[in-house]
Design a protein with these regions (language model features):
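Structured catalytic-domain cores with a bias toward divalent-metal coordination
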Residues: 1-330
Length: 330
């Protein structure tokens, strides 16, 4: 499968989206790529899909689809994860933008709110098998109330992957509580963006807070040549599943792995080190040595589970790795 070349962006301080609207009403879908600037598999797939619509190979039957190939152009131009900070944290509009990602939020959040369904395409630093993340079960909690559980999980099961993860925001909030406690013990104020549970707000959380539903696709390791194809099939399946384009019905996968995030561990010092090069979904046993703090303290697994999103490049006070457990519930 051939994909268009990634574009140069001579002026990264502006934003671009491409929207197709059918004559008949229907669902409003938005597809994001390069929320993190070095994750471009989704961008390649989105550009291919845009070209197919523009060339007449595809026709929107109903509703609307908006494509954003490069959501964070500054980070993309720098070929790095962030521009000034992580766009997928504290994603909320502000009257007083301080960094570039604040400006992105002021553009992106209203755009998300104008749609009903989000597919956000990412890739990961360490690991091999693509997977998708979906949100909570229906609930009325203050942190992340939600009413579209069936639709969201139904979409996730049709993206073409067989591994699924949930529990993100709830686990992040628990991690924030631990972060605040540590700061107070060490003389910190316990105040600031990364000590607010809402700091965990990213694109999918923003979409859910606007009344829609959202799925994140992690389409493979950053440099995996199969990544754009995984992303392309997910976009196509989503368009068909929502009835936006014609195509044979996409069946939900029935044989899959479902994991729930249950714990997050921060890097406390820039010299904290893993004891080996962990990859997402490596199995860990209770008591197994995972890393060593700069002061020599050992970091061991608190339970049997799987390590997720191990980040050797994380900064002190930010997430170092997550632990997930198998979930037998659909």
């Amino acid at each position: 499968m051939q994909f268009p070349a990634l574009p140069a962006i001579p002026h990264p301080l502006q934003f671009k989206s491409v929207t197709f609207t059918a004559l008949k009403p229907g669902p409003k879908l938005i597809v994001l790529g390069a929320v993190h600037g070095n994750e471009v598999s989704g961008s390649k797939a989105i550009l291919k899909m845009i070209a197919e619509f523009e060339e007449g190979a595809r026709l929107l039957q109903k509703g609307q689809v908006t494509f954003v190939p490069i959501t964070n152009p500054l980070a993309y131009n720098r070929k790095q994860r962030n521009g000034d900070r992580n766009l997928n944290r504290n994603l909320t509009p502000t009257d007083n933008p301080v960094d570039f990602e604040d400006h992105v939020a002021n553009w992106l959040c209203p755009l998300l709110a104008a749609h009903e369904v989000l597919l956000d395409i990412h890739s990961f630093q360490k690991g091999d098998v693509p997977f998708a993340l979906f949100g909570p079960k229906n609930n009325k909690s203050k942190l992340e109330s939600f009413t579209h559980e069936e639709a969201e999980r139904g979409l996730a099961l049709r993206l073409g992957v067989t591994r699924f993860v949930d529990g993100w925001l709830d686990t992040y909030a628990k991690g924030v509580a631990n972060r605040v406690e540590l700061l107070k013990k060490t003389g910190g104020s316990g105040e600031g963006l990364n000590t607010d549970p809402r700091y965990g707000m990213g694109t999918t959380e923003c979409m859910r807070s606007s009344g829609g539903y959202a799925v994140t696709l992690e389409c493979g390791q950053h440099e995996d040549p199969q990544g754009p194809g995984v992303a392309y099939r997910a976009i196509e399946n989503t368009l068909i599943h929502l009835g936006l384009v014609e195509g044979a019905a996409v069946e939900a996968v029935t044989d899959y792995q479902h994991l729930s995030l249950v714990e997050v561990n921060d890097k406390q010092h820039f010299e904290d080190q893993f004891v080996r090069p962990w990859s997402s979904f490596d199995l860990v046993r209770k008591g197994e040595l995972i890393g060593i703090r700069h002061n020599g303290d050992e970091v061991r697994a608190s339970r049997d589970g799987f390590i997720v999103f191990p980040n050797t490049l994380s900064q002190a006070g930010q997430e170092w790795f997550y632990i997930a457990e198998s979930n037998t519930q659909p």
